[in-house]
A protein has these predicted regions:
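Conserved beta-strand scaffold positions in the cores of enzyme catalytic domains, especially
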Residues: 3-7, 83-85, 145-147
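Loop/turn-to-beta-strand initiation segments
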Residues: 59-63
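Short, well-ordered alpha-helical microsegments
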Residues: 71-74
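Conserved substrate/cofactor phosphate-moiety recognition/catalytic segment
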Residues: 1-51
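Small-molecule kinase domains that catalyze NTP-dependent phosphoryl transfer to phosphate-bearing small molecules
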Residues: 105-160
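Conserved phosphate-donor/acceptor-positioning beta-strand/loop module used by diverse small-molecule
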Residues: 79-100
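Short, structured coil segments at secondary-structure junctions
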Residues: 1, 79-80, 141
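Structural alpha-helical scaffold elements that stabilize or flank donor/cofactor-binding regions
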Residues: 56-57, 76
Length: 169
């Protein structure tokens, strides 16, 4: 459809983009040069992330910004036309992330592994995201909010997304 993907994680942790893309394609042995000894241990700050995202938005007429909330600068928010909110309960969200990270990092994210504490903290963080937190982040958004059921097949939700994006063009 010609949209440029802006995944927020890639901006906080730019060195992991190749690894994330490979994982989406089912490849889990891609090696990256991380900023710290442990992947995801050294992040850019929010100001740097906002600037980098704003630059990429300015460079791409059509983009999809992927992330948990939309607490962005007015410059970024003013360009967003639709929000797709993939709704899934916290327990399922944590289960999916845990499964994905175990596939991606193996024993490193299990108890005793060098990434265990970091990933455990991350799972606790995402498990604590409430629907209210997302609603609060959307409070100033003026565009359409499209709710997607995260328990439905990916193909079903993708069809909804495709139809909504076609309305923009």
């Amino acid at each position: 459809m010609g949209y440029f993907e802006i995944d927020v994680e890639d901006y906080y942790f730019p060195e992991q983009k190749e690894s994330r893309q490979a994982a989406l394609e089912g490849e889990y042995d891609v090696k990256c040069n991380y900023l710290g000894e442990i992947p995801y241990s050294e992040a850019r700050n929010k100001s740097e992330v906002n600037q980098a995202i704003a630059r990429d938005i300015a460079s791409h007429e059509k983009y999809i910004l992927c992330g948990v909330t939309i607490n962005w600068s007015d410059e970024i928010l003013s360009t967003i036309q639709k929000v797709f909110w993939l709704k899934v309960n916290s327990a399922e969200r944590v289960r999916r992330v845990k499964r994905r990270e175990e596939k991606r990092w193996g024993e490193r994210v299990l108890a005793g592994g060098d990434m265990y504490e970091q990933q455990d903290s991350f799972r606790n963080l995402i498990g604590g995201f409430s629907e209210q937190k997302v609603l609060d982040s959307l409070s100033d958004f003026k565009g359409e909010i499209v709710e997607l059921d995260g328990t439905l097949p990916i193909s079903t939700n993708m069809q909804i997304v495709k139809e909504k994006l076609e309305q923009i063009n």
